[in-house]
């Protein structure tokens, strides 16, 4: 109010006072308007914070605003302020506070007679009442009533356009559907939640909704989609600084990684989750993470004995067990006891049995079928190890029945595999085969939904015992029966399982499935990864390996998503596989033999295929072969190793690995090797033949046969069924001695460190390769003028290689440094030059090569250790040769170890001379090696490293 002024007579003074009155009156009005304007701004700021999901920040603004003297606010502003407070409390899950705030809003609206706000508050209070009643019914397990009441609240919110009220009711309904196993309703509800969360910019709920959709696909055993949604949830949570609010996304992602065989990535996510739960003093969740972490570390060490873990599985589980007993959580205790029993089976049967019996007893008490089925399976395994086969069968069957009841596919296939092992020990091979087939069929349902080869390889990693078991029992049946039908069945099984991921991906690429390499998101993620390598502080950091793993897999997810978008209508049809008769009549030539190897825990096999024969030879167990091969490779790769040592070990391996009738045969003229496991790193050409009559000198295998290598029978067969190209515009493309800038040399340290844990003290040197430059020049000179293109030093850039139409070249020769990573196989790379200011870093990685297309007759990787990579049993080596074969090259020559570049030049020149003279690829390589054997460079170090993979025939 304006204070009443006293009366004044006219004159100068009254006029002056009038102006003063007008001035102060106007100022008061301006102050009031400014106050209202400032209040409106703050209310709008709070509203925008709320709409962006920043509820706590919004509350701080509002509480400061409404705490000022009531006289400075009008009722409408107060009502609006308290309405925002109520909605913030609602969104934060503080329902009682939200209810009280809505009651106050209703009172303020009554005072102002603001019908709109009054109706909003009244409707909100009714929704809260329904929400609380539905939650009570859910706690009482009156699920139908709870669902109906939640739906009433949701419909009321929808009718009035109250999205925030609808969102929270939907969230609770979603939890109800999960609890009662209504998975399709759960999925639909999760999609609705995601849509509303995005509409409201509620990032917290968006993360939770993505996590829910991931959980749905995980439950449905669609591991690719569950990985995708969990990955999106975590990425968004990190971006919005919400990860501490949703650590469950990390544990969910870890579970999917575990099921995909990505154990080290699972460890990384679990360790991140553990830090959050410990900080929050969430003991139950901490215990859950501890036992999951222990199991992930155990499986990773089982897969890679050299794996370094900060904590040992048994110590983690013991800690988790003590904590579970302290908080009296019997459900967690039962699971931990089971896991303790599981990791003790190989070392302490009695101790393992004690843990498992305790776990089973608690599982039965709690009626926890997951614990019961797992404990029964582990107890069955103990009985099998003790040769109590009938008891083991009984326990496996009980475990199988329980696992089926809860649709636990992982447990079901393990039970079938256990039963197969039992029947195999009883000599009932047909029954064993049936159970192995059941195990295979069970996890194939999960595998069929995995949409990327690298993830399929990880998934297959834990299923080797089934793959090996199928082949092993068929070998037993073949040995005992000699039935041609069994031969066909064994052949088909080998064909089905060997390098199957390679064949599946080859079919996919033929259908045109390629990612959009220009995607902004992909380019951004590539930049993040490259930036990671540019920071020296990442070297030696204990979490750096996990961080790089996470970045790599995020890149893959973006890539896979783009592929899926471009191929939604794609049909998944596999190319037909050859029959044994077809292989022998239409593929194998007179004089050609194939040796196909399978390494096994108890015994290994060599399968000999020729036009007239299919024989099986029994070999020593994998560990014996592996020990001898590692020693031999060490001798081969050392140019000063003793000749006698080479002869001794080479002859022993020759006796083990080469069938005597093959070596003695005068009818075999060429040999193809399909290696398994460590044999992928063995140059069979160097094996000594000791079957000659006394007095004959001991010769290398290469002196008798030309040798080539293949990934599988099916892949070799398929390469011959496709017509070769004839319309090449150029004969030869050569890249040699790329000149690396200092930036690339600096990055090399980081890349080597993450590639193979190489010591930081062993600083890498990217030395120039002057002979490689001479190599490609001299090779190119063998071809007609204008028949080839050469790029070397500064011109041998990654940009240049990618810019070329590679399909126009018959032969591509890359003489450069190579970087092979067994820990990050998709980051293995060829090191080319890079231009200043270019977006390309000079490291041509496997996943970049995947985006290229070839139709070359031959790729020559004249680079250090370019044959190496991640060795996967049955699948082969995941590395550079494989990817070049996959994208369209008919064959690849690569090296098994670092070779002197002058010796490499000599070998390559001789090889190309033979090739251009019309020799088959494997024969040209053989002649080049024989020439070196007869020279001063006769040591295998100089000539044995280079091997031919793929189609071995003539080019000219």
Description of each model-found segment:
Residues 230, 270, 631, 658, ...:
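A domain-level signal for caspase-like cysteine endopeptidase catalytic cores
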Residues 430-704, 715-750, 760, 781:
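Amphipathic alpha-helical protein-protein interaction segments
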Residues 716, 810-910:
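Catalytic cores of nucleophile-dependent amide-cleaving enzymes
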